[in-house]
Amino acid sequence: LTRGELGTRGTPEIRDQESASAAEVMGVKIRENLGFKDGFFQNDEEHQLEVIKIIRKYKPKIVLCNAKDDRHIDHPKGADLVSDACFLSGLEKIKTKLDGKTQQSWRPLNVYHYIQWKNSSPDFLVDISGFENIKMNAIKCYSSQFYDPKSKESETLISKKNFLDTIFNRSLDLGRLIGVDHAEGFTSNKIVGVESINDLI
């Protein structure tokens, strides 16, 4: 949504490079940034329409977005903005154009939210055992934000020495709850269903 220009550490240009590196680690084929104003974007018509254009462009069945309740004010704002845009994107009477072409309405089937700073109770857990190192390597691409004893920039809560350990340990603990090595938790605005009880672990 933003380029993180208000971040205490690093610059938007550094963040662009870090994002590209993280995308490569994860095998992401396409990454776009809407360039909203960091800290000041709103969940309003102007911003919703820009998100709707992206939803209609890619037609995702599942959308993952920020935590609904979090320390950083942009995270819940982003969560509400994307969630609302996902609903509105399905309304035929909302007209949008991209590259001069009229877009068709599209509503994702599900919107799920990450667990970020706060230890929110997950609505479901995904077994990520075997992928935990890829996750951590992708996160470490954003090195300007994390612990660096040589850095001259101000310390933040996520630049403390043990921060990355807390991320790894959370996936260990969530994995423990479902009997696997590592798990990732998500929250949902609606009840999550499965096609078969055999899908549950």
Predicted regions and their residues:
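Active-site rim/loop-helix segments in enzyme catalytic domains that contact anionic ligands
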Residues: L1-Y58, T187, N198-D199
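Metal-dependent de-N-acetylase/amidase catalytic core
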Residues: E45-I201
